Structures are given as structure tokens and as C-alpha cells.
Amino acid sequence: MMEITTIDTKSKLKLNKEIFAYTYNEGLVHQAVVTFMNNARSGNSAQKTRSEVSGGGKKPWNQKGTGRARAGTIRSPLWRSGGVTFASKKRDYSQKLNKKMYKRALRSIISELCRTGNLVVVSDFQCDNHKTKDFLKKMNQMEISNALIIMSEVGENEYLGSRNLIDYDICDVTTIDPVSLLRFEKVVVTEAAIKKIEEQLQ
């Protein structure tokens, strides 16, 4: 077991070494990030080729005798309202990553945050109201300007207070992902969330 000090109450909290002192695996973390980002892609981009655009079945003018350049269809990619030469199609970008690998990747990231001092533990995190101003005041008191806050359960006040801020994000233990963990300078975790993380990544 290892220990970490909470920044608000200065109490010692024991952490599971298997979760918070895991060997960093850069290749696995990269794979988890790429998989997560690809799975978030909609893949809805779609265009039409010359054969898919409606119309253009008739030759616009005779091959010879008009003095104009020859043309076979008004839906040529060279023409306005024509098809696209290399049209993009709907595509499924999703990738599969085994649960064990995904958990190990999260362990690697969390352990690295712990080693570098960017994992901050608080006894509890609650806002008295839903105002963004008060949420920012709370973060300024902790001297944290850019952070992901992980709670066991996200309350309405905390969610609404942080929703409009680009430098902060808030989530519960079940929705943590590798991209969010790496995106912010600090990761603030409550004591209750620490216990749930240990259960989830065991």
C-alpha cells in the first residue's frame, strides 16, 4: 500500500499499489487513446460520384461539329453540380480494445499522474449552488486552474457550475476515459471516488 495526502484536510489516504503505482506502458496508452477517439467518430461524411448524382444520362451535345470541348454527361466532376472525383463514403471507424487492456491503460495513466504529482485528492467536493462564479472560486482556493474532477457521483450543482468552462470538466468514476485524463493539467479525485476507482480497475 502507498499513501497520499488530501489537500483540504491534510489526512493520509492509503492507495492500492496495483492501481496507483502501475508501470507506465506508453504503447498501450497510445492504443487506448486512438481507440477511444476513433470510436467517438460518427463517420457520416458522404458524397456522390458522377454515377450517383441524379441526371446526366443524355449527352449534352454532339461529339463533333459544335466547336466546343467534347462532353458525355452534365454530371462530370469537372462540371458545376457534377459528382465528386474521389467521393467520401460513410465509414465505421470503431475499433475494439479488450477490457483488460483498457483497464491497464487507465492504470498506467493514473499511476503516471500520481508519480508526477498531478493527481490531487480531496476529502469531498461539493458546491453550495450551481453558479459558475462560485465553482471558480472553489477551484481558485485550491490553486488549480485546469483540471478534471472525478467524483463518485456528480451532483447537479457541480455539473451546472462547471458546464460552461473550457478549463474544467467533471465526471463520475464510471465515465472516466484516457483522453480526459491526459487532457488536463491536474486530476482532482474525491476520497469516495478513489475507492470506486480501485474497485473498477482491480
From Swiss-Prot:
Pfam families: Ribosomal_L4. It comes from the Bacteria. GO terms for biological process: translation. The keyword Cell membrane does not apply. Keywords: Ribonucleoprotein, Ribosomal protein, RNA-binding, rRNA-binding. One of the primary rRNA binding proteins, this protein initially binds near the 5'-end of the 23S rRNA. It is important during the early stages of 50S assembly. It makes multiple contacts with different domains of the 23S rRNA in the assembled 50S subunit and ribosome. This is Large ribosomal subunit protein uL4. The lineage of its organism: Bacteria, Pseudomonadati, Pseudomonadota, Gammaproteobacteria, Legionellales.
